[in-house]
Amino acid sequence: MLVTWEATRACALACRHCRAEAVPFRDPRELSAAEARGLMDEAASFGKPGVIFIITGGDCFERPDLAELAAYGSGLGLHVALSPSGTDKLTKAALAELQDAGVNVISLSLDGATAATHDAFRGIEKTFDRTIAGWRAARELGMRVQINSVVARHNVHELPDIAALVRDNGAMTWSGFLLVPTGRGVDLGSLDAREVEDVLNAFYDMGEAVPVRTTEGHHFRRVSLQRHVLAGRGVTGEAMIETMHLGTLYR
């Protein structure tokens, strides 16, 4: 079982898609440390195998009690993971402290293959550089890293280059998040049905080089099965493209 706790709305970024509509300062209605421990107690009561307990936000590093809570959850047998933002708080020292508290897995967001694309989406300059630096620091510490990429019109043509970054820097998983138009994301450009088919087929191809999964793209499993069957029948290349009715975005 997986439990995701949005521990705070506070975040230094201004991401264009943020469903939490994060703000620079913490909300007084956030769970206190005692309430957070109670939440972890409840999650731990679910039994074995231990729950994967993801602490996110906002930016989870905005909570000064983050390491304390991570250690508490780890002590209960929870598999505590973090999903921090690419800010100046994402340092090797901070990651090492969390690793000492029992955190061995983090997820980071990479929404462009270049600083220009990623930073424009995240609303703050240097976010791309900080994310790459945090990614490499986590890997140097021996932590496992999942890379999450929102898939929308702003970056769809950069997906192959993002895949190359995942391949070169190493990650346990690359997850493509098909844009959910909620929060600040209601006005962003979602892909249409034909374009989604093209993207999911591209993810299938890129999965030969990097470990790929999707979020809010449940039909990726259907595409994977179709492609597996076609490959078994020797249907590849242009014949596959025609059979799957793929469009210009895939090409």
Write out the residue ranges for each language-model feature:
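Conserved alpha-helical substructure of the radical SAM core
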Residues: 1-101
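A short hydrophobic/small-residue beta-strand
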Residues: 16-17, 105, 173
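Radical SAM enzyme [4Fe-4S]-AdoMet core and its adjacent flexible, acidic
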Residues: 26, 79, 99-101, 109-111, ...
